[in-house]
């Protein structure tokens, strides 16, 4: 790995809109010239890395450290290396031979956010920040609390009151974060925490932070290594749109390095009640129109003004991808199907990606011969209340065999 001095000189921040560049160690979250989003840029033409080097390391986020900005020993809990499951039964039902699910719920805090937080919190330490903060629909707060605890620095999280699954709040509280519940929605919480970080020096670790997204791009790297080839289509639930943006950026870097010769079709799935990105794609809008009151059972993607919409629209359009909505009923049905037909337990938002593929197949919008990777983003136990509401309660019986046989209809 490069020494700290060498590596800091080898990457910088760049505006995705006007191209303005900024030093790697400047703490900014938007372009100072035009206000648009930033991305980390590496001089890939001079980067000394080989696929064989990666292949000799364990499958994890840090397998790909040459394409990550951290120069200190990372704050890590061995995140990444999540399983890629072949969905044989569901694929057969849909007429798809090559349908896969990348189960990000198997990360340390139970969601894909850990990939971003291992890098983001490591960067906070590297940059000398003493505290970190985020707004969250749940998973970001849980992950930030976990990694801040590992780093030994305070964390502040803002949540929309009454709109975060109990499992996620429990994680943030148990790991010692200062949890603030606001009477408002996620977008308002994000605006507040952004202002807090700018005015009081906390390090913001929402997906507006370009360094956090660097960790999340490794989902695509791992899927490529696990499949042995570039998938034809990469499907993700879309909330704040950081994940689809990050994975797309990662694949572009691999293409520029000559490691792959094509990009997957980036496909974003949103809940019908929270779908500004889908609307922008359908209506060919240059940017998303924020939704003031997004609503869906899938709390993790209940976001009306996605921060990374600009990057997400580019990812979908430039790869010939698709964007589609699914109803809450379709999401919950797929959550049950993944559990009962494939043995994969996910939270509602996670099921959106596979539910979206089912819908696209029914619409005749995709080739059934495609090799498709669906990212399922969080674990079943993130939102146990939604699970309990869907299922029949346990059958209570007397403690004797006849009662048991009767309950089992035997």
Residue ranges of predicted features:
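PLP-dependent amino-acid enzyme catalytic core
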Residues: 2-410
């Amino acid at each position: 790995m490069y020494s700290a001095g060498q590596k800091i000189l080898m990457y910088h921040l760049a505006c995705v809109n006007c191209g303005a560049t900024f030093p790697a160690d400047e703490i900014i979250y938007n372009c100072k010239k035009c206000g648009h989003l930033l991305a980390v840029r590496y001089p890939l033409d001079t980067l000394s890395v080989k696929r064989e080097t990666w292949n000799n390391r364990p499958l994890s986020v840090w397998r790909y450290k040459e394409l990550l900005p951290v120069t200190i020993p990372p704050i890590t809990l061995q995140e990444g290396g999540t399983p890629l499951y072949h969905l044989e039964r569901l694929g057969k039902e849909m007429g798809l031979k090559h349908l896969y699910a990348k189960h990000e719920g198997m990360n340390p805090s139970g969601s894909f956010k850990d990939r971003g937080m291992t890098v983001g919190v490591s960067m906070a330490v590297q940059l000398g920040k003493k505290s970190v903060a985020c707004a969250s629909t749940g998973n970001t707060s849980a992950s930030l609390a976990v990694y801040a605890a590992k780093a030994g620095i305070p964390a502040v999280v803002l949540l929309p009151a009454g709109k975060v699954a109990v499992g996620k709040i429990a994680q943030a509280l148990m790991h010692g974060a200062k949890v603030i519940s606001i009477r408002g929605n996620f977008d308002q919480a994000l605006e507040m925490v952004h202002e807090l970080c700018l005015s009081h020096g906390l390090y913001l670790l929402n997906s507006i932070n370009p360094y956090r997204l660097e960790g999340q791009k490794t989902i695509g790297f791992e899927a490529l290594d696990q499949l042995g080839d570039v998938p034809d289509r990469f499907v993700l639930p879309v909330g704040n749109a950081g994940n689809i943006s990050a994975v797309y950026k990662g694949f572009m870097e691999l293409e520029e390095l000559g490691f792959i010769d094509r990009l997957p079709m980036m496909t974003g799935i949103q809940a019908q009640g929270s779908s500004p990105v889908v609307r922008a794609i359908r209506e060919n809008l240059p940017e998303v129109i924020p939704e003031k009151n997004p609503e869906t059972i899938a709390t993790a993607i209940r976001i009306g003004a996605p921060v990374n919409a600009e990057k997400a629209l580019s990812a979908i359009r430039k790869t010939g991808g698709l964007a589609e909505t699914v109803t809450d009923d379709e999401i919950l049905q797929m959550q049950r199907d993944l559990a009962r037909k494939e043995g994969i337990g996910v939270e509602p938002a996670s099921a959106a990606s596979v539910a979206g593929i089912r819908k696209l197949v029914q619409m005749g919008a995709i080739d059934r011969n495609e090799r498709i990777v669906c990212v399922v983003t969080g674990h079943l136990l993130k939102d146990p209340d939604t699970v309990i509401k869907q299922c029949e309660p346990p059958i209570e019986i007397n403690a004797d065999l006849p009662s048991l046989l009767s309950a089992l209809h035997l």
